[in-house]
Amino acid sequence: MSRYRGPRFKKIRRLGALPGLTSKRPRSGSDFKNQSRFGKKSQYRIRLEEKQKLRFHYGLTEQQLLRYVHIAGKAKGSTDQVLLQLLEMRLDNILFRLGMASTIPAARQLVNHRHILVNGRIVDIPSYRCKPRDIITSKDKQRSKVLIQNSIESSPHEELPKHLTIDSFQYKGLVNQIIDSKLIGLKINELLVVEYYSRQT
């Protein structure tokens, strides 16, 4: 299944706020209306919707998300928490969290078009897994700097996650540590996502 490129508001109206996909928010009460219209949700549908939330927020294909679930399942620790850490440490998501891109699809474009350096080298792979002490900067070209500057200036200035630091004057971000999955703050039950895939096998 390919990455979703359809109407974004349609997705947030059904699934709720997905800040990685779009800065728009669903109207208050829309979740209740949807639930009333479709009746009581089955356990399968609840797990499916949590999986869809995670997939659309991070802008992944079905295959990509399944691969991350498999990697998390083989790692030490709780599968659901490792899964979130893997997704949060992707370069496209780090750019979004730093405010250097307004959404994860916008961050992916910056990376694909070679505007981003990690530790002084161009990285054009959005799924690149960032590590502690990685330094993320824009390429030393006017167009690259303008794109980053516009995003930083228009970002909602929410409190930066503790695992990241940004110098907005030098267009430079620093990864301080691997994120604690408990501090991610998404309204997604990642355990239900893992359960969804475990029941598919």
From Swiss-Prot:
GO molecular function ontology, one term from the record: rRNA binding
Protein's cellular compartments: Plastid, Chloroplast
Assigned GO CC terms: chloroplast; small ribosomal subunit
One biological process term in Gene Ontology: translation
Domain of life: Eukaryota
Keywords, comma-separated and alphabetical: Chloroplast, Plastid, Ribonucleoprotein, Ribosomal protein, RNA-binding, rRNA-binding
Sequence similarity: Belongs to the universal ribosomal protein uS4 family.
Complexes and interactors: Part of the 30S ribosomal subunit. Contacts protein S5. The interaction surface between S4 and S5 is involved in control of translational fidelity.
NCBIfam families named among the record's database cross-references: PRK05327.1, rpsD_bact
Role summary: One of the primary rRNA binding proteins, it binds directly to 16S rRNA where it nucleates assembly of the body of the 30S subunit.
Protein name, per record: Small ribosomal subunit protein uS4c
Native source species: Dioscorea elephantipes (Elephant's foot yam)
Annotated gene: rps4
